[in-house]
């Protein structure tokens, strides 16, 4: 990543050095996941749509510990592998919006809350800013080479309410709490990086 773009990493020291952790990452460009994997202080295993595992990318992504998920169904194999990452004290990366969008955490799925509550892992919000600002000159599908991309790690927090409940209502409530925390982190990240202007 450092050879292609100019990542500026803020708050990496906030990531717990050991134990299970979930990175909740906003998602507006295809390079967001690789960017976080490249700059994170700990190895990260992302849940990635199965459509990305094509050709030579399949053995490559699998070899570096990324997790294939079928988004059209409750993929029990992917769920089990993701929980396994947390059980082994690893870092699980999730795009809580479920797919690429505006990257503003406006619509979250319940999966993040499920993994956080079931896996007993704190959530670290991660904002990737600048990846979708403008297309590159040589490759339109990528940000301009050597352009700055900011990756801002936030304070870890617990998704549950302390009751240990895993009911649908409890997960819905946890999702609401998570969304507020992620949105607040994104706003703070924009202030820290001076990227408010990109919204105007």
Regions found by a protein language model. Give the residues of each.
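Proline-rich intrinsically disordered, low-complexity coils
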Residues: 7, 16, 20, 34, ...
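Non-catalytic C-terminal accessory region of glycerolipid acyltransferases
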Residues: 77-200
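Short, conserved catalytic or adaptor-binding loops enriched in Gly and charged residues
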Residues: 1-2, 60-61, 143-144, 150
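Generic structural signal for residues in well-ordered beta-strands
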Residues: 7-9, 151
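Catalytic core of membrane glycerolipid acyltransferases/transacylases, capturing the structured
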Residues: 2-3, 10, 15-74, 81
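A broad structural signal for alpha-helix termini and local helix breaks/kinks
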Residues: 3-5, 40, 119, 186
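N-terminal membrane-anchoring alpha-helices
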Residues: 1-6, 197-199
């Amino acid at each position: 990543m450092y050879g292609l773009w100019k990542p500026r990493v803020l708050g990496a020291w906030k990531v717990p050095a050991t134990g299970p952790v979930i990175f909740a990452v906003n998602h507006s460009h295809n390079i967001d996941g690789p960017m976080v994997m490249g700059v994170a202080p700990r190895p990260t295993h992302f849940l990635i749509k199965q459509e990305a595992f094509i050709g030579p990318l399949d053995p490559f992504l699998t070899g570096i510990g990324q997790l294939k998920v079928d988004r059209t169904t409750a993929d029990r194999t992917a769920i089990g592998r993701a929980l396994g990452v947390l059980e082994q004290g690893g870092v699980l990366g999730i795009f809580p919006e479920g797919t690429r969008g505006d990257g503003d955490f406006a619509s979250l799925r319940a999966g993040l809350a499920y993994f956080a509550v079931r896996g007993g892992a704190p959530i670290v919000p991660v904002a990737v800013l600048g990846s979708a600002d403008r297309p590159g000159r040589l490759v339109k599908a990528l940000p301009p080479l050597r352009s700055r991309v900011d990756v801002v790690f936030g304070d870890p927090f617990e998704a549950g309410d302390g009751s240990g409940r895993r009911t649908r209502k409890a997960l819905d409530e946890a999702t609401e709490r998570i969304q507020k925390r992620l949105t607040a982190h994104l706003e703070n990240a924009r202030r820290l990086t001076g990227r408010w202007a990109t919204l105007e």
